[in-house]
């Protein structure tokens, strides 16, 4: 398991969150959910997911913070949730990583040495179950993995 915390911002993401978290199963040591006071079953799902993750040596911590903006919410999560892993990753609850990327993260991230402090990923955008390969949608390059304490 990689020394990685995945930070996920939520607001009524009960229908998406499980798939996102499960795409990291066995890869991420910790998940931090920063919720904007959901009114669906997001909080209850987080408790359930934490129980499942603890059985494989991972954990999911649920926090709530009032929404101001995306950047403020992410920065609040990075600064107030005691992240102590070497690496952090930002995800949206409606995103998931593919199995080959999960394997690559698990195998390669522990070997990334300083001065590298961030990893850029090529995101695939899907619409109605189909990968949008053209029209400027791929590759969409995003800095998503970063050394903890080196971004905010």
Describe each model-derived feature in a short phrase.
Residues 1-5:
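Extreme N-terminal starter segment of soluble prokaryotic enzymes
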Residues 8, 12-27:
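Short, well-formed alpha-helical segments that are part of the catalytic scaffolds
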Residues 8-9, 29-37, 63, 93:
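Short beta-strand/loop segment that forms part of the nucleotide-sugar
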Residues 18-19, 40-49, 100-101:
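Acidic helix N-cap motif at the loop->helix transition within catalytic regions
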Residues 23, 35-45, 67, 92:
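A conserved acidic beta->alpha catalytic loop
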Residues 43-80, 84:
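Conserved donor nucleotide-binding strand/loop of the catalytic core
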Residues 71-78, 85-91, 97-152:
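Catalytic-site signature of metal-activated, phosphate-bearing donor transferases
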